[in-house]
């Protein structure tokens, strides 16, 4: 893996800060890569870390300010998204109360910070507002996981068709990789996911970005056969284009079947290696990776 580690260090775009309010200079090398995207998907390997949520918020600000994205699809709670959309457009309602009643992975100060930033921005630009993407009432929510994946993709497609907005989709890695036959473990559940439907619809206009990490609070270092074990050789926080020019042996590593972390609410650190995504390669699943070496827990709403 030495050659892959050397390539990562040569290609990595170092992040100067994870602070959502930091200047965008270090992100500007991404402009050309993301300029033509219709949907940029920020898929986190865990939705319970401060750093991955902060960098997702930072990328949201960049995409809105620099590349004209005007909708945020916050995966996981359609009712909460509808209330948050009303808040960011009109100021009606209490976003803290909405998120406190939402699904557990949305009950964080980091998500609330992003909501409040959108409202603040919309107040400054009342004629050019950022929206929360809303579920289409004609899309039947699936009961089985395969149906849920189709529904996630269909709602995204219909919102884009309805509004014409470029969309930042903030959700989970398992849903957003381009995974026609990816497997979620434990349980070894294999089915086509939302990201593969979105790639089919938008082609290169769908850009999946993996938000990954090596270790952190109550999470041991990545197993040696996980992609993160190699990604950890890069800077403390960076962006990597998985389709940049690479030597043949590095390209073989990028194209080889791999595993990545996948940490949900039932995660058990004593059985860390069991919680992973498999059934594809980094280069198949993702266009970009944002890797943070060390993470801590998100700040829960009180």
List where the protein language model places each region.
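Structured catalytic-domain cores with a bias toward divalent-metal coordination
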Residues: 1-302
């Amino acid at each position: 893996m030495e050659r892959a580690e050397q390539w990562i260090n040569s290609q990595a775009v170092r992040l100067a800060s994870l602070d959502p309010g930091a200047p965008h200079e270090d992100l500007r090398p991404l402009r050309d890569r993301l300029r033509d995207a219709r949907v940029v998907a920020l898929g986190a390997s865990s939705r319970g870390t401060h750093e991955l949520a902060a960098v997702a918020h930072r990328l949201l600000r960049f995409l809105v300010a620099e590349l004209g994205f005007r909708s945020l699809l916050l995966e996981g709670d359609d009712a909460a998204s509808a209330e948050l959309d009303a808040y960011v457009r009109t100021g009606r309602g209490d976003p803290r109360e909405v998120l406190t009643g939402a699904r557990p992975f949305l009950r964080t100060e980091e998500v609330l910070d992003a909501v409040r930033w959108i409202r603040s921005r919309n107040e400054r630009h009342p004629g050019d507002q950022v929206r929360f993407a809303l579920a289409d009432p004609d899309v039947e929510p699936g009961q089985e996981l395969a149906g849920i994946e189709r529904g996630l993709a269909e709602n995204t497609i219909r919102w884009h068709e309805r509004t014409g907005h470029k969309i930042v989709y903030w959700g989970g890695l398992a849903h957003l990789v381009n995974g026609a036959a990816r497997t979620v473990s434990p349980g070894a559940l294999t089915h086509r996911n939302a990201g593969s439907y979105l790639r089919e619809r938008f082609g290169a206009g769908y850009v999946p970005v993996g938000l990954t990490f090596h270790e952190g609070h109550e999470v041991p270092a990545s197993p040696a056969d996980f992609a993160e074990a190699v990604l950890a050789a890069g800077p403390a926080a960076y962006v990597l284009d998985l389709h940049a020019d690479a030597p043949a042996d590095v390209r073989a590593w990028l194209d080889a079947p791999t595993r990545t972390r996948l940490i949900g609410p039932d995660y058990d650190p004593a059985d860390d290696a069991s919680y992973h995504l498999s059934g594809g390669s980094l280069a198949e699943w993702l266009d970009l990776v944002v890797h943070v070496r060390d993470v801590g827990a998100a700040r829960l709403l009180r």
